[in-house]
Structures are given as C-alpha cells and as structure tokens.
C-alpha cells in the first residue's frame, strides 16, 4: 500500500527532510567533484528526487528516512555516471 499523503502533507515532509540532500551531498563531495558536477544542479536534481521519494514511500516497506537516503544516493550516482559518460563522449569527439 502506498502512502496517502495530501499535497500539503507531502510538502511538509519534503521541507522537513531537505537536510537529507545536504547530508548526501556532503558524504559524496568527492564524487561530485570528480564528476565535475555543479553543486546547485545536484541540489536541484536531489530535491526533485526527494519529492518523488516521499510520493513513492510505502510505510509497510520500512522507514521513511532510509527510503529517502537510498533514493537520493541512487539519484546522485545516476547523475554522476551520466556526467562521466557525457564527458567521455565529449573527449572522444575532441580527440578525433
């Protein structure tokens, strides 16, 4: 069963968990730097993922914060991976 949060409840939960974004970014600052990601862009991507994480949260499957952190880490890894692939393709074109 999915959650039945109203939009105002969802927004309140998101606002109270914005600190999770900063925590994930701090834990992964080396990855963000290595992938040459803009921190403002990363924050925005993770904020969107936070909203989706709250909307997709199923209370029967575990703790909300664990779900949020897992979703944020997954999004950051996906973003970094995409950036590295794009950077590699750019370098290959530039070398040709």
Predicted regions and their residues:
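Alpha-helical promoter-recognition and RNA polymerase-docking modules of transcription initiation factors
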Residues: 1-87
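Internal acidic/polar
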Residues: 89-96
């Amino acid at each position: 069963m999915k959650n039945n949060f109203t939009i105002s409840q969802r927004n309140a939960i998101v606002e109270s968990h914005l600190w999770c974004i900063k925590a994930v970014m701090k834990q992964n600052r080396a990855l963000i730097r290595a992938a040459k990601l803009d921190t403002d862009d990363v924050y925005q991507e993770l904020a969107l993922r936070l909203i989706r994480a709250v909307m997709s949260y199923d209370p029967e499957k575990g703790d909300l914060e664990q779900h949020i952190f897992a979703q944020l880490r997954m999004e950051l890894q996906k973003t970094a991976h995409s950036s590295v692939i794009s950077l590699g393709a750019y370098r290959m074109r530039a070398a040709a």
